[in-house]
């Protein structure tokens, strides 16, 4: 791709399915539930390696439980298992219509989820950007938003939910520690959506992302943001104005009501801020995720309020 593509709906449907990976390759699919009506958020996260080793994760936070509730299951999946019916322990994921519809569920001891996702726009594939996906962070990835209908039960308490979901899919090499820092940002109202991924590695900053509104998706060419930390160096305020390749702009304000904390590597720490947003004046939901080198984060957090 030598210029900024606009034909996002033509991204091949085979990439909605499982990929053949090298032994050091990794494939993962994040499904993020944003539930401000309960003060809750969570995710279901299937991942697998080229070796066949796989993991399913479920994680939720909310005011009804004092600590983040997490469950996971590790195992080995068959080489011929597809995303039409991917199963591991308590997790099942089924891509029922490529790049459009997904069923996903978790039946654990504390967490039980059954959800149906339907996309509201075409997938944004990083390969459609002239510089593609940074190769240390995968061969490719797609980002997509959609509507979700879910029944969620945590510790026996029911949380029926109709809302909006953030979903991403990545495959290929994944060397978490190379990024010194990244910002993985999403916002959606259902009618409009925005995403950007700003990665800082090897002294360079890479930006990928899209703006979707009025039925048109375009690459982002600029993001201008401000944010503020709390005393634990968790992002609590975030505002951004984005500009796309057609010169369109959107302004989004994030009211971060809670943070999911996770890590997939001892060198990194991931703080996923879950938010209500105002997107060009319309209500929506979003994600404001900051990833840090763990040594830097552990050192710098004592100074975040004063200097950050």
Residue ranges and their predicted role:
Residues 1-308:
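Structured soluble/peripheral alpha/beta segments that form catalytic or ligand/cofactor-binding pockets
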């Amino acid at each position: 791709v030598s210029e900024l593509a606009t034909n996002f709906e033509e991204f091949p449907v085979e990439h909605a399915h499982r990929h053949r990976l090298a032994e050091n390759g990794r494939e993962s699919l994040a499904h993020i539930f944003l539930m401000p009506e309960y003060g809750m958020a969570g995710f279901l996260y299937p991942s697998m390696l080229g070796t066949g080793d796989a993991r399913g994760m479920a994680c939720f936070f909310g005011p009804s439980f004092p600590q983040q509730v997490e469950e996971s299951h590790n195992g080995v999946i068959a080489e011929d298992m597809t995303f039409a019916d991917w199963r591991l322990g308590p997790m099942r994921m089924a891509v029922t219509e490529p790049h459009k519809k997904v069923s996903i569920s978790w039946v654990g001891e504390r967490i039980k989820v059954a959800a149906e996702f339907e996309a509201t726009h075409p997938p944004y594939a990083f390969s459609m950007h002239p510089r593609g996906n940074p190769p240390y962070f995968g061969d490719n990835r797609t980002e997509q938003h959609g509507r979700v209908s879910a029944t969620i039960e945590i510790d026996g308490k029911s949380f029926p939910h109709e809302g909006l979901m953030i979903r991403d899919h990545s495959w290929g090499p994944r060397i978490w520690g190379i990024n010194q820092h990244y910002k993985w940002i999403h916002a959606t109202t259902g009618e409009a959506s925005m995403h950007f991924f700003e990665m800082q590695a090897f002294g360079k900053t890479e930006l990928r992302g899209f703006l979707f509104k009025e039925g048109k998706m375009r690459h982002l060419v600029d993001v201008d943001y401000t944010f503020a930390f709390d005393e634990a160096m968790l992002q609590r305020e975030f505002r951004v104005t984005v500009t796309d390749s057609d010169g369109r702009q959107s302004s989004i304000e994030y009211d971060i009501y809670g943070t999911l904390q996770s890590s997939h590597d001892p060198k990194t720490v991931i703080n996923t801020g879950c938010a209500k947003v105002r997107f060009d004046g319309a209500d929506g939901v979003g994600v404001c995720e900051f990833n840090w080198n763990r040594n830097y984060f552990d050192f710098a957090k004592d100074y975040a309020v004063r200097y950050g």
